Swiss-Prot record:
InterPro entries: Fe_traffick_prot_YggX (IPR007457), Fe_traffick_prot_YggX_sf (IPR036766)
SUPFAM superfamilies: YggX-like
Function: Could be a mediator in iron transactions between iron acquisition and iron-requiring processes, such as synthesis and/or repair of Fe-S clusters in biosynthetic enzymes.
GO cellular component terms, semicolon-separated: cytosol
GO molecular function terms noted in the UniProt entry: iron ion binding
Biological source species: Shewanella loihica (strain ATCC BAA-1088 / PV-4)
Name under which the protein is recorded: Probable Fe(2+)-trafficking protein
GO biological process, one term: cellular response to oxidative stress
NCBIfam families, A to Z: PRK05408.1
Length: 92
């Protein structure tokens, strides 16, 4: 049976992550409060950020920026700003 969490991003009960994907206290917070669906949404945004901003995951500043964006997206309800990106409309 799947583990469920009260997802802070989706604001509903949903299937939780199978295991802690991110290290440390933030990783525990994500594991306890973020659903698989919300994590998948974040991963898509993360990929776009890395590509559009040409982030280097070996660079500490780039990793810190990405972590800040992740917290803003998952816990504070802030949309990720990606220059030039226009979301596709449902009727397209």
């Amino acid at each position: 049976m799947a583990r469920t969490v009260n997802c802070q991003y989706l604001k509903k009960e949903a299937d939780g992550l199978a295991f802690q994907l991110y290290p440390g206290e933030l990783g525990k917070r994500i594991f306890d409060n973020i659903s698989q669906e919300a994590w998948s949404l974040w991963q898509a945004k993360q990929t776009m950020l890395i590509n559009e901003k040409k982030l280097n995951m070996m660079n500490v500043d780039d990793r810190k920026f990405l972590e800040e964006q992740m917290v803003n997206f998952l816990f504070e309800g802030k949309e990720v700003e990606i220059e030039g990106y226009v979301p596709q409309k449902d009727d397209e």
